[in-house]
């Protein structure tokens, strides 16, 4: 009889890289980073498709006869907008003659505003004021501020009011021989023979607690009044000074102008200018007192429920070629905390006409069709990686990646993996070992780690005996990683406390502080991932060792009396009794069917943070199955000795 010795052959060479882990090491033919850097996409997006609403005009109006060529959004996104061609929130607030008057109202956690262009210099609205841009800026700023604190908002287009009997509604030549719907202009006829100066006007209006189905906790009201250069310009008959003042129910002045105590401008001119201040007022009854000749009466408001903090996105709204625009929307958003501004980089070039259907704007708003993990001033991200190459500019909400250098992200083994025995003394040793301490044993094992992300933790052995990770080992591993993470976070908190001392009212200092805090978070997370990587490598190593032990046991069982295991991973076989086909059956069975080993694991690592939080709070969670694939033997290298 001719006896030969068949062993599993060691296959490591200089092309392999060594990966040290907690509880075991690996040699691997390849390696990859635990996460890749992501790049934000420019433009707007939302965190949740079911909780946002838009307010727009013809560029989001699905009922426009030229839709979809006239639109800057998809049909799906247009359904989310409250829009009417020719409309704008400010037009509906003031109601200038001949302009679209649309009842804007709706509810959403995230509000997207793409409107404003219909009240711009091109509209040439006068009504005692040729340039309304500063009023528009103040109006839009207040809208964005209140919208960010409310779930629902609505135009209230008819306030209850009481006006004095001696006044009548009036029109103005410089307002298309009409006047604004809000404020309404009332005048008092003065009979010089009886009463030269007339009577002081006293009027009342009520801000409701509810308008239709919309609750009103706060109203945005336009407090409008005339500005005169001098008393003589106001009243050439020598009557008293001009005043128009709003009082709350307690008699406190909340808005207006009183030239009895405030000086006139002192400029030269004989035509008054109308000024409108934006007031945030609670529901209730208010009084208006004015000098006899004119009364400007609030008739409308925007109502907000103030029920929850939310997100606001404002989209730059400008005309195309040949029409003059303003940039009040841009300036209002930039001066409102938490408002994200979407801006074009090129002139507006429409498809339907010069002013409707711009390709760049369509690209910037295409993200509204999707849900993002993070939205920011820098753009939106829907990839799961926690890292981006550049710092995302605030405001930002959701699970936002942190800035990191690619080389700082830990690498994990990939491709062909070879385990070493490791040093975790709490791991049960296989009854029949095919490896010695720090030896390399291989049956050409291949493990695939699929999806973007990392394979994860092996949380325990399926066998009560044999190799693998014991409960005690896993507990000790997680105790170690937990302690190390707490140390990292404690160090981060100490650094943040030191930075707190540097906070000032200077905006740049606050921005610098925010950046430093994010950098500290990024460094802490990278440290945490380093610990996770070490535990991951160790547990994969132990799992592979168990797989090899199972392979050796399977070979011994298949061989029966035909082969005798003389040492770990080596068998003596009688060549005359077991020919080549017999040996192939024993040693090469895996070419037709892989050896069942470790099942898929629930081990995906994800970053957790509170939605709508400025920045990302760091927390690690093990979530859905990611698929450390079952180990399949791809081939056994056999060495034979006689």
Curated annotation (Swiss-Prot):
Enzyme Commission code(s) on record: 3.1.1.53
Cytoplasmic side: 639-642
Cell compartment(s), UniProt: Virion membrane; Host cell membrane
Chain residue ranges for the region called Fusion domain-2: 353-638
One of the protein's GO biological processes: virion attachment to host cell
Pfam family membership, one: Hema_HEFG
Enzyme class: hydrolase
Keywords in alphabetical order: Disulfide bond, Fusion of virus membrane with host endosomal membrane, Fusion of virus membrane with host membrane, Glycoprotein, Hemagglutinin, Host cell membrane, Host membrane, Host-virus interaction, Hydrolase, Membrane, Signal, Transmembrane, Transmembrane helix, Viral attachment to host cell, Viral envelope protein, Viral penetration into host cytoplasm, Virion, Virus entry into host cell
Any single Gene Ontology cellular-component annotation: host cell plasma membrane
GO molecular function, one term: host cell surface receptor binding
Glycosylation: residue positions: 13, 48, 131, 382
Main localization of the protein described in the UniProt heading: virion
Disulfide bonds: 7-570, 107-152, 127-175, 197-239, 216-303, 224-276, 333-339
Region ranges (Esterase domain-2): 298-352
Catalytic residues, chain numbering: 58 (nucleophile), 353 (charge relay system), 356 (charge relay system)
Signal peptide range: 1
Region (N-acetyl-9-O-acetylneuraminic acid binding): 138-297
Membrane disposition: Single-pass type I membrane protein
SUPFAM superfamilies the UniProt entry points to: Influenza hemagglutinin (stalk), SGNH hydrolase, Viral protein domain
Protein name: Hemagglutinin-esterase-fusion glycoprotein
UniProt organism field: Influenza C virus (strain C/Great lakes/1167/1954)
């Amino acid at each position: 009889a001719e006896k030969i010795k068949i062993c599993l052959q060691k296959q490591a060479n200089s092309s392999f890289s060594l990966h040290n882990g907690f509880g075991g090491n690996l040699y691997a033919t390849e390696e990859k980073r635990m996460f890749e850097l992501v790049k934000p996409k420019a433009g707007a997006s939302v965190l949740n498709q079911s909780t946002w609403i838009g307010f727009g005009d013809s560029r989001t109006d699905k009922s426009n006869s030229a839709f979809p060529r006239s639109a800057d959004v998809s049909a799906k996104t247009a359904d989310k907008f409250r829009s009417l061609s020719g409309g704008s929130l400010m037009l509906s607030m003031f109601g200038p003659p001949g302009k679209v008057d649309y009842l804007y109202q709706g509810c959403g956690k995230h509000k997207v505003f793409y409107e404003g262009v219909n009240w711009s210099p091109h509209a040439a609205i006068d009504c005692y004021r040729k340039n309304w841009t500063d009023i528009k800026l103040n109006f839009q700023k207040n809208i964005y501020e209140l919208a960010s604190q409310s779930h629902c908002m609505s135009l209230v287009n008819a306030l209850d009011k009481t006006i004095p009997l001696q006044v009548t509604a009036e029109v103005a030549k410089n307002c298309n021989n009409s006047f604004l719907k809000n404020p309404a202009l009332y005048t008092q006829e003065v009979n010089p023979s009886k009463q030269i100066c007339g009577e002081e006007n006293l009027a009342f209006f009520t801000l409701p607690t509810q308008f239709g189905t919309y609750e009103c906790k706060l109203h945005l009201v336009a407090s409008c009044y005339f500005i005169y250069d001098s008393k003589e310009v106001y009243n050439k008959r020598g009557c008293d000074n001009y005043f128009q003042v709003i009082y709350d129910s307690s008699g406190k002045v909340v808005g207006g102008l009183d030239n009895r105590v405030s000086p006139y401008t002192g400029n030269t001119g004989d035509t008054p200018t109308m000024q409108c201040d934006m007031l945030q007022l609670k529901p209730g009854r208010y009084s208006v007192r004015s000098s006899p000749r004119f009364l400007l009466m609030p008739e409308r408001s925007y109502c907000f429920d103030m029920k929850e903090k939310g997100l606001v996105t404002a989209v730059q709204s400008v005309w195309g070629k040949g029409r003059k625009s303003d940039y009040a929307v841009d300036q209002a958003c930039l001066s409102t905390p938490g408002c994200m501004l979407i801006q074009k980089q090129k002139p507006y070039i429409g498809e339907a006409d010069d002013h409707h259907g711009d390709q760049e704007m369509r690209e910037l708003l295409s993200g509204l069709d999707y849900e993002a993990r993070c939205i920011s001033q820098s753009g939106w991200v829907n990839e799961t990686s926690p890292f981006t190459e550049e710092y995302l500019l605030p405001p930002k909400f959701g699970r936002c990646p942190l800035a990191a250098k690619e080389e700082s992200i830990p690498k994990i083994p990939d491709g062909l993996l070879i385990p070493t025995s490791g040093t975790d003394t709490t791991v049960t040793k296989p009854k029949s070992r095919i490896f010695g301490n720090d030896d390399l044993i291989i049956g050409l094992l291949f493990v695939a780690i699929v999806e973007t992300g990392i394979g994860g933790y092996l949380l325990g052995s399926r066998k009560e005996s044999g190799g693998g990770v014991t409960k005690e080992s896993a507990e000790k591993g997680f105790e170690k990683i937990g302690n190390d993470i707490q140390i990292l976070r404690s160090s981060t908190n100490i650094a943040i406390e030191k930075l707190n001392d540097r906070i000032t009212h200077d905006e740049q200092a606050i921005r610098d502080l925010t950046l430093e805090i994010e950098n500290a978070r990024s460094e802490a997370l990278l440290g945490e991932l380093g610990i996770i990587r070490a535990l991951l490598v160790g547990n994969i190593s132990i799992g592979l060792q168990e797989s090899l032990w199972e392979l050796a046991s399977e070979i011994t069982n298949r061989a029966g009396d035909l082969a005798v295991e003389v040492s770990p991973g080596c068998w003596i076989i009688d060549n005359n009794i077991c020919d080549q086909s017999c040996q192939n059956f024993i040693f090469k069975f895996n070419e037709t069917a892989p050896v069942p080993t470790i099942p898929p694991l629930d081990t995906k690592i994800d970053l957790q943070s509170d939605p709508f939080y400025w920045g990302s709070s760091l927390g690690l969670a093990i979530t859905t199955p990611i698929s450390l694939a079952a180990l399949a033997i791809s081939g056994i290298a056999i060495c034979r000795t006689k």
